[in-house]
Swiss-Prot record:
Coiled coil ranges: none
Its job: Usually encoded in the trnK tRNA gene intron. Probably assists in splicing its own and other chloroplast group II introns.
Entry's localization field: Plastid, Chloroplast
Keyword RNA-binding annotated: yes
Origin species: Illicium oligandrum
Protein name, UniProt field: Maturase K
Alphabetical list of InterPro entries matching this protein: Domain_X, Maturase_MatK, Maturase_MatK_N
Keyword list, A-Z: Chloroplast, mRNA processing, Plastid, RNA-binding, tRNA processing
Length: 505
């Protein structure tokens, strides 16, 4: 237990005891605004002001004065009440305070991860989502099995609070955290509904991301600790290892089960394989290994019991699916990924005899998933369920260039993200749908036909839907009538956000 605490950096001297008074500092709300996800904390809603949104520190001053005059909890009571409170509704002030509070509780985490953040700043390319795919291409082609893991949502509210207690020792801040959680509709249930999480994340994006990341950090840190202990397994008994890693005493029941069932073999099987790899994006993770199917089943058993006994979370075993990489493709993230066997024939000769050798090379393949992308286009009303392009309604004062730029920007974003796929025919189909939908939208606006629009704006439409790479290729080989179906994939190290239509995993 002491070693686990040391690994996680749980030191009382690093805990923050005086965070609550920071809620009364104007600079905290300014920082929350500058570094916020949507930059909305200091902007008054239109329904409150009646004129355009403008950044205003006057709102913050009013809030702080009211917080000094009254109890903070009185301000937050009935946060959804639309009655006016100092000229604004209570939910607006509640959101401001929650965003400011999220900025405050990030302080201990920032101090703890200072060294890691410095390393990340030096390796700017590692921030790109595409940086994970070269790793998958290099490692996964030699592995046998993969587990698709849907990380359960944090459930019991007190578990979130207890997790943050390892970083924050300020009692008023923890009470305020409980107040935020228990005061939100549908957050007082044992198992948090996905709909409630989606609603909460939209209303308080920064606050939600901090809570979720702290939960995932706790889960992954213990797994990393266990994996690092594997180098000592050959010098100690599995029983002693189980005694040392009892997960803060919360997994005593799990350890009893492990001692009774797999005392001799489980932990050795879990960690003796050096080819176990783990990757995560948002709420989905994959774990792949060169080991047997039995090894992956034991990992699945371990994870399910860990979630149940450490986070008091009843996780269905169906959230972890084990498949062979050789005949299974998995979504991660925005790609359909799997192992493809490239057959090849080698001609050999010994003295006067020649012979042919059939062989195959494993390659990690990334495919653009057509069905989820079509579903995203249907949801955005670019086409029907059969993939047939349809027109979109536009404002009467929208110019042709604005409409074309809008469609072209979506097309370029999708092409940019899916540039790593070696098979582009699915992507070309999506681009065709967007281009024809754009033409139909223009025809609807001008009350004309698609053929007339294509004749009038044909070259302009074509150029807008070309990527930079395709423009260069068109200049080099202008006679090429259609793009090749197979080409080398390109990974861009400047992508830090997935377009909504690409994030269908």
């Amino acid at each position: 237990m002491e070693e686990l605490q040391g690994y996680l950096g749980i030191d009382r001297s690093c805990q923050q005891r005086f965070l609550y008074p920071l809620l009364f500092q104007e600079s905290i709300y300014a920082l929350a605004h500058d570094y916020g996800l949507n930059g909305s904390i200091l902007y008054e809603p239109i329904e409150n002001l009646g004129y355009d949104n403008k950044p205003s520190l006057l709102i913050v001053k009013r809030l702080i004065i009211r917080m000094h005059q009254q109890n903070l909890f009185f301000i937050l009571v009935n946060g959804s009440n639309q009655n006016r409170f100092v000229g604004h509704n209570r939910s607006f002030y509640s959101q401001m305070i929650s965003e400011g509070f999220a900025g405050i509780v990030e302080i201990p985490l920032s101090m703890r991860l200072a060294s890691s953040l410095e390393q990340i700043a030096k390796s700017h390319n590692l921030r790109s989502i595409h940086s994970i795919f070269p790793f998958l291409e290099d490692k996964f082609s030699h592995l046998n099995h993969v587990s698709d893991i849907l990380i359960p949502h944090p459930v019991h509210l007190e578990i979130l609070v207890q997790t943050l207690r390892r970083w924050i020792q300020d009692a008023p801040s923890l009470h305020l955290l409980r107040f935020f959680l228990h005061g939100h509709p549908n957050w007082n249930s044992l198992i948090t509904p996905k709909k409630s999480i989606s609603l909460f994340s939209k209303e308080n994006p920064r606050f939600f991301l901090f809570l979720y990341n702290s939960y995932v950090y706790e889960y992954e840190s213990i797994l990393v600790f266990l994996h690092k202990q594997s180098s000592h397994l050959r010098s100690i008994s599995s029983g002693a290892f189980l005694e040392r890693t009892n997960f803060y005493g919360k997994t005593e029941h799990l350890l009893v089960v492990l001692r009774n069932d797999f005392q001799k073999t489980l932990w050795l099987w879990l960690f003796k394989d050096p080819f176990m790899h783990y990757a995560r994006y948002q709420g989905k993770a994959i774990m792949a290994s060169k080991g047997t199917h039995l090894l992956m089943k034991k990992w699945k058993y371990h994870l399910v019991n860990f979630w149940q006994l450490h986070f008091y979370l009843w996780s269905q075993s169906g959230r972890i699916r084990i498949n062979e990489l050789s005949n299974h493709f998995f979504y991660f993230p925005g790609y359909l990924s799997g192992i493809r066997l490239n057959p090849s024939v080698v001609r050999g000769q010994m003295i006067e005899n020649s012979f042919m050798i059939d062989t195959g090379i494993k390659k990690f393949d990334m495919i653009v998933p057509i069905i989820p992308l079509i579903g995203s286009l249907v949801k955005a009303k670019f086409c029907n369920i059969s993939g047939y392009p349809i027109s979109k309604s536009v404002r009467a004062d929208s110019s042709n260039s604005d409409i074309i730029n809008r469609f072209g920007r979506i097309c370029r974003n999708l092409s940019h993200y899916h540039s790593g796929s070696s098979k582009k025919h699915n992507l070309y189909r999506i681009k065709y749908i967007l281009r024809l939908s754009c033409a139909k939208t223009l025809a609807r606006k001008h009350k004309s036909t698609v053929r007339t629009i294509l004749k009038r704006l044909g070259s302009e439409l074509l150029e807008e839907f070309l990527t930079e790479k395709e423009e260069i290729l068109s200049l080099i080989s202008p006679r090429t009538s259609s793009p090749p179906h197979r080409e080398e994939g390109i990974w861009y190290l400047d992508i830090i956000h997935i377009h909504g239509m690409s994030n269908h995993s």
